[in-house]
């Protein structure tokens, strides 16, 4: 119980202290040691990729601090709309190393420290850069998951202030991965997170990155990148140590029903309804309302993402499968079904879905989405069959 109370108190302090961090939090002496801290993944969605921070340890002054570029608050005005549009602001925060170790120990997460082999001049340059970064006008930055996050900020803070020549090792025998492949490595056991990522990420997320540096948005990639680096003839990392061993596995299988299972259940329901409709030679317009409403909402979200500042989301072929127009055409489509009249929407949606299927050759579209889209296509085909063989025939018979 005491440990829980202490954890809550420290969480409150960590949520307040970083926001109040000032440039005068830092001190400097010749005894300063600067390290890269790489944290193992947590269970929350935003923690599944790990975390990066900078340890600034002024031994002579007893000032052992951690600079953290991952501070955000759900209480920011319009947080969710801003997040969807890629307009979320993060900030740098300062806490003591002891506080950080306590929090990560409680969460069962590990921390690896790499002490950098820097000259006094390089340490002082990092010190000045951190002080400047902690000025009130500089603490906030516009977060970008692939290009400007807590790891890339730490990367530039440390590596951009090195003097002389630095060589980084890389495996040139392996092709460079795509953004989608890299992030999937960190949530391969969380089917729903991967599914959500695959819905939102578009065509460009499947293109290989162009340089090794573009892989450094992930904490463990940065750790490996500097691990074998040679700086002016000496190893850039002079000492590696494990500050905390992870005590909880972040790779536990998801306990929820998977997206694939949901898609199979939908397929069984869709087949059953389709057989009933075919037997009765009529459309169940309530079912069509449901399909069009859900498809339209998903499509509308993907349409909004076109204007998002998030990378790799604007060109997304899934929008052709879940066309946003469906949401706005429900009244006229239902009216035509009840009056047994032809409607252009079924042909348009059929063409749109076919384009989406063609797009799956260029973009990784989740199998559950393709299963659902297949039955949306069959529903369109059934409506066209109904128009041609039932509605038209009925009208012709009445005319006679």
Question: Where in this protein do the model-derived segments appear?
Answer:
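The feature marks either
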Residues: 14, 18, 129-135, 163, ...
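Membrane-proximal intrinsically disordered regions of secretory-pathway and membrane-system proteins
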Residues: 24-28, 240-246, 256, 387-400
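Soluble non-transmembrane domains of integral membrane proteins
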Residues: 146-216, 220-223
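Active-site nucleophile-His-acid catalytic modules used for acyl/amide transfer and hydrolysis
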Residues: 100-176, 376, 380-383
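Non-cytosolic juxtamembrane linkers/loops
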Residues: 189-289, 296, 306-309
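Generic detector of multi-pass transmembrane helix bundles and their immediately adjacent loops
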Residues: 274-278, 285, 289-400
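Glycine-rich catalytic cores of cysteine/serine-nucleophile enzymes that process amide/ester linkages
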Residues: 29-109
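Bacterial Sec-dependent N-terminal signal peptides
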Residues: 1-25, 394-400
């Amino acid at each position: 119980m005491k440990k829980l109370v202490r954890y809550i108190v420290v969480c409150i302090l960590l949520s307040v202290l970083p926001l109040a961090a000032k440039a005068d939090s830092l001190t400097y002496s010749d005894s300063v040691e600067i390290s890269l801290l790489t944290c193992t993944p947590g269970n929350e969605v935003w923690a599944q990729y790990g975390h990066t921070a900078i340890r600034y340890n002024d031994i002579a002054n007893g000032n052992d601090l951690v600079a953290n570029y991952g501070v955000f608050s759900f209480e920011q005005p319009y947080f969710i709309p801003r997040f969807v549009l890629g307009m979320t602001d993060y900030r740098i925060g300062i806490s003591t190393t002891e506080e950080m170790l306590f929090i990560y120990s409680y969460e069962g997460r590990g921390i690896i420290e790499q002490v950098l082999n820097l000259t006094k001049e390089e340490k002082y340059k990092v010190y000045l850069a951190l002080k400047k970064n902690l000025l009130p006008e500089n603490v906030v930055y516009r977060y970008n998951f692939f290009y400007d996050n807590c790891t890339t900020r730490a990367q530039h803070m440390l590596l951009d202030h090195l003097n002389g020549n630095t060589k980084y090792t890389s495996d040139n025998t392996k092709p460079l991965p795509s953004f989608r492949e890299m992030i999937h490595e960190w949530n391969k056991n969380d089917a729903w997170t991967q599914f959500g990522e695959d819905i939102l990420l578009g065509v460009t997320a499947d293109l290989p990155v162009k340089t090794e540096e573009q892989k450094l948005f992930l904490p463990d990639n940065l750790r490996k990148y500097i691990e074998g680096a040679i700086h002016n003839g000496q190893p850039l990392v002079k000492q590696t140590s494990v500050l905390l061993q992870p005590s909880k596995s972040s790779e536990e299988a998801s306990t929820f029903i998977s997206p694939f299972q949901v898609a199979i259940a939908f397929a069984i329901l869709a087949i059953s309804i389709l057989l009933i409709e075919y037997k009765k030679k009529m459309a169940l317009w309530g079912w069509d309302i449901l399909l069009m409403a859900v498809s339209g909402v998903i499509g509308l979200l993907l349409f909004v993402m076109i204007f998002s500042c998030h990378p790799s989301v604007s060109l997304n072929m899934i929008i052709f499968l879940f066309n946003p127009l469906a949401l706005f055409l429900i009244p006229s489509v239902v009216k035509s079904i009840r009056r047994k009249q032809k409607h252009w929407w079924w042909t348009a949606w059929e063409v749109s879905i076919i384009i989406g299927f063609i797009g799956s050759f260029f973009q990784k579209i989740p199998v559950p989405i393709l299963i659902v889209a297949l039955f949306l296509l069959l529903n369109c085909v059934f409506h066209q069959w109904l128009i041609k063989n039932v509605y038209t025939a009925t009208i012709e018979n009445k005319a006679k």
